């Protein structure tokens, strides 16, 4: 896949709406207002060239130019000038990154063909694959690092990560506070009653006679949606950061973020055919009624038409493969693979639609039902103590806490919840040594990270096609969700895991331009997970038995591993060019959507794995340092194809090329370009020779789709 993106932007800013439009009440009741626009020339390079020191890659203060890894940084000014509203828009200025398309919720990015992670001030956050939209407005800078994290940060995914640096009153380059209070107030309105109010203020202050800085940011949104039945978005965000100089030796940095989000995921269209894509022609029709007790919902038990304990609308057609040639048989042959004398393999009559017709589908009509919901409450806190000793040693104690409470319900047949929290305690001891020919920076870092999780999924009898999108969700398609009765879950995991790690990093730079960066880390992880059997559906898509004999009830295990990295680079004098080579092996924990570990992965040791990276590249600054470029060629691979989480951490091998240019032509004009070529291979699918997939209408060209849209055929 190739991606070529060119950014060519004259930058200007628009004044806010009139003061009356900034009243609090407008957040909830948007009114019509005339927008007054002024054009204002912005001077400088828009803070879009990577000149600042960034410690989110290796833990040392190096600029992106000097860092021997493929990485990009996006400043607050750059996000403002390019009008970036959510995390997905960061891909415009970062090669190797892609939107996840996770049911319309911008929780994270795919980096180098696999799901990426998010970090907050250099500490890994809980997984967020569509749990809630990750906010970017409260960030001073976002660093996008491609490939696994450095050993100093602990186990990490293979693809890469985004590190969010919250707005602060302390100037990162100098360590001083901003000279005076500064703030901003803005209100945004638009189509579909878009209503967003943001406010921020920060500056210097004193507490107990000690100098300090503060920065507060708040955001409120109450917006409708283009899509029918969608609840829109209601969210509130509060972020605070504080810096206190206790004395000349010790400083405190503490703060946090609270984010409350309510919306809905969007599964898009169903009953997909080529005619729908080409001409907008949608197959209408009603699924067979299954709600036998008349409560308006179809329970798992009501999907068991013949009463044998197994669903009858989700057969696994092992003799048909959407990965191979199109199935060319007839409907009768499809339903009777053993021949007419053997009887039907499954009952196709209950899957056929009734009152079939066609219609032109309004693009605003999707699978969202009126009572669908996605609710997430996340709290993030940090408290750092930094001591700069007279001997030159710097000791940093970082304490981090994050929790989220998530509920996700979709009428077509999917629900989940998770209640998870993580606490990380990290000590970093470092010093810079300077000699006649070189300087050396070292970091030693023991750490402890504890994660506690409770997570449940409900995806058995998940039927996308039963709903006729020309009308609302009804008792013909709406399923009784496990989260509403707290029973009949497909998977349910309760447990915890604790990672004890120790890392050492060294950054060696000779004054002739040669630089070596190396590090090693050891992790020992205690993990346990269990399933409450009384809350599970039997049989289900995860447990293929009706008596519970197939359930992995509980497991505990101890795993350990070593991570390392080695980079060498050379700053070629008077050229502005820095070629580099990086080799690394990084541990990873195979956690799911709610940070959970499955019982089977814990029992088998498959909850822990390593990844390998080989990367070659060259970076440079030319034209009086107004043009920055970066070129990298890489190959990275998860080492154990059997250890994976399908949604969040798959066993993948990727290789490719990434290229980035940012050119500040003059004080008004910025030109940027990114290029990505990536090939991703799922190692588990290659090893198994197949991969489970839902079979669509295009895979069975000789069978009328309306004969199957009342259920869902699976295959491999």
Give the positions of each predicted feature.
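N-terminal Sec signal peptide and the immediately downstream disordered periplasmic leader
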Residues: 1-84, 88-96
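Outer-membrane beta-barrel domain signature, strongest for Gram-negative TonB-dependent receptors
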Residues: 236-443, 450-451, 628
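Solvent-exposed loop segments that connect transmembrane elements
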Residues: 266-365, 462-488, 528-557, 591-604, ...
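Outer-membrane beta-barrel translocator/receptor signature
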Residues: 138-140, 151-239, 246-251, 379, ...
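Face-selective signature of the C-terminal outer-membrane beta-barrel domain
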Residues: 377-404, 417-536, 569, 573
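Short acidic/polar hinge/loop motifs at secondary-structure boundaries
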Residues: 99, 108, 124-148
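Gram-negative outer-membrane beta-barrel transporters
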Residues: 512, 626, 630-637, 650-716
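Structural signature of Gram-negative outer-membrane beta-barrels, strongest in the C-terminal barrel
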Residues: 438-458, 493-637, 654, 664-666, ...
């Amino acid at each position: 896949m190739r991606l070529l993106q060119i950014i060519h932007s004259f930058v200007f800013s628009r004044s806010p709406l009139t003061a009356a439009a900034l009243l609090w009440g407008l957040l909830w009741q948007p009114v019509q207002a005339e927008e007054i626009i002024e054009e204002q020339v912005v001077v400088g390079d828009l803070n879009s060239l990577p000149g600042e020191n960034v410690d989110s890659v290796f833990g040392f203060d190096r600029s992106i130019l000097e860092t021997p890894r493929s990485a990009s940084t996006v400043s607050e000014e750059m996000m403002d000038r390019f009008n970036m509203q959510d995390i997905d828009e960061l891909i415009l200025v970062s090669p190797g990154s892609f939107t996840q398309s996770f049911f319309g919720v911008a929780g994270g990015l795919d980096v180098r063909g696999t799901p990426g992670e998010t970090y907050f001030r250099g500490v890994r956050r809980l997984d967020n694959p569509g749990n809630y939209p990750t906010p970017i407005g409260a960030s001073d800078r976002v660093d996008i690092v491609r490939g696994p994290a450095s050993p100093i940060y602990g186990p990490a995914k293979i693809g890469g990560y985004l590190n969010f640096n919250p707005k602060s009153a302390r100037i990162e380059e100098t360590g001083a506070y901003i000279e005076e209070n500064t703030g901003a107030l803005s209100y945004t309105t638009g189509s579909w009653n878009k209503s967003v109010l943001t406010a921020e203020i920060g500056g210097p202050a004193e507490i107990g006679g000690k100098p300090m800085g503060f920065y507060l940011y708040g955001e409120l949104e109450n917006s409708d949606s283009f899509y029918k039945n969608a609840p829109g978005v209601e969210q509130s965000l509060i972020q605070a950061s504080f810096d206190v100089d206790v004395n000349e030796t010790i400083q405190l940095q503490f703060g946090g973020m609270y984010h409350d989000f309510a919306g809905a995921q969007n599964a898009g269209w169903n009953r997909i055919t080529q005619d729908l894509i080409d001409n907008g022609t949608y197959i209408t029709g009603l699924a067979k009624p299954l709600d036998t007790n008349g409560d308006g919902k179809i329970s798992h038990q009501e999907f068991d038409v013949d009463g044998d304990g197994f669903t009858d609308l989700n057969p696994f057609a092992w003799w048909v493969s959407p990965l191979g040639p199109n199935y060319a048989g007839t409907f009768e042959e499809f339903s009777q693979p053993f021949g007419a004398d053997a009887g039907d393999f499954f009952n196709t009559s209950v899957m056929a639609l009734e009152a079939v017709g066609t219609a032109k589908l309004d693009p605003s009509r999707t699978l969202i039902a009126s009572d669908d919901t996605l609710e997430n409450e996340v709290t993030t806190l940090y408290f750092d103590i930094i001591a700069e000793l007279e001997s030159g040693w710097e000791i940093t104690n970082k304490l981090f806490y994050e929790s989220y409470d998530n509920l996700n319900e979709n009428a077509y047949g999917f629900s989940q919840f998770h209640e998870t929290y993580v606490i990380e305690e990290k000590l970093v001891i470092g010093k810079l040594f300077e000699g006649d020919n070189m300087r050396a920076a070292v970091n030693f870092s023991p750490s402890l990270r504890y994660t506690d999780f409770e997570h449940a999924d409900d995806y058995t009898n998940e039927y996308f096609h039963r709903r006729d999108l020309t009308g609302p969700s009804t008792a013909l398609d709406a399923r009784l969700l496990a989260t509403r009765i707290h029973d009949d879950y497909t998977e349910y995991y309760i447990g915890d895991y604790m990672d004890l790690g120790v890392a050492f990093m060294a950054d060696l730079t000779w004054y002739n331009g040669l630089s070596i960066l190396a590090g090693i880390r050891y992790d020992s992880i205690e993990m346990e997970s269990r399933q409450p059997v009384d809350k599970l559906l039997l049989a289900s898509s995860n447990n293929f038995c009706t008596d519970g004999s197939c359930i992995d009830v509980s497991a505990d295990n101890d795993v350990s591993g070593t991570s390392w990295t080695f980079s060498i680079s050379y700053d070629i004098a008077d050229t502005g060019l820095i070629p580099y080579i990086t080799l690394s092996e990084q541990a990873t924990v195979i956690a799911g959507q709610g940070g959970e570990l499955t019982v089977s992965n814990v029992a088998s040791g498959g909850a822990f794995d390593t990844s390998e990276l080989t990367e070659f590249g060259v970076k440079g600054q030319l034209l009086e340092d107004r043009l920055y470029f970066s070129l990298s060629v890489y190959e990275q691979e998860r080492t154990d194809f059997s250890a994976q989480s399908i949604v969040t951490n798959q066993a993948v091998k990727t290789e490719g090329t990434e290229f980035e240019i940012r050119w500040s032509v003059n004080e008004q004009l910025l030109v940027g370009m990114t290029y990505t070529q990536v090939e991703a291979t799922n190692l588990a699918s290659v090893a198994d020779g197949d991969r489970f997939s839902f079979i669509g209408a295009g895979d069975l060209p000789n069978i009328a789709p309306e004969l199957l849209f009342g259920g869902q055929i699976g295959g491999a």
